[in-house]
């Protein structure tokens, strides 16, 4: 269970409302986002530690969910392969920027290393209208593109069984973006 409190002076607090979010009890976040970038269609997202969230309305006192609870694609490689936890968003980004940026703690076991966790790369959050409701999506912040040094791009490559495409690039870190149409294939490896 979560509670929303308000204060005029940050010393005296008033209980405003309660909200139930199943299977999680920590690291809440509550923030507005436009749906499909439309500033006339603002919804609020109530977020919890395990990447579960509600989309709804907030009148300054009470959050009202408009649809069932969702998860931000917990097994998606775009969201740390299901290892992301306890995400929080920045609230002081200039309004003219227009983004809601989030960073998460990531559970990671790295044998032989002196650390066991890390922070995910910052992600830009957006709300999008789909056939069965409004969904939250996350994508790496555009500032990461400034870190790229060498790039390789190709289009229209047709692959068959055992085919290989070599870019001639190497390094310790690679940022790979791929769009694949499976055609008759059941799997493709990278």
Q: Each predicted region: which residue ranges?
A:
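Acidic, glycine-rich loop-and-beta core segments that form the ion-binding/anion-interacting portion
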Residues: 33, 44, 49-64, 71-73
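Surface loop/turn motifs at the tips and blade-to-blade linkers of beta-strand repeat domains
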Residues: 18-22, 79-80
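Short, solvent-exposed loop/turn segments at the edges of secondary structure
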Residues: 23-25, 49-51, 82-84, 120
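Conserved Ser/Thr-centered positions that define the repeating blades of beta-propeller domains
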Residues: 4-8, 56-57
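Structural signature of eukaryotic scaffold interfaces centered on beta-propeller domains
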Residues: 27-40, 83-96
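Beta-rich accessory regions
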Residues: 59-74, 78-85, 91-190
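Hydrophobic core segments of beta-strands in well-ordered, beta-rich domains
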Residues: 1-5, 15-20, 28-31, 39-50, ...
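Residue-level detector of beta-propeller blades
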Residues: 12-15, 65
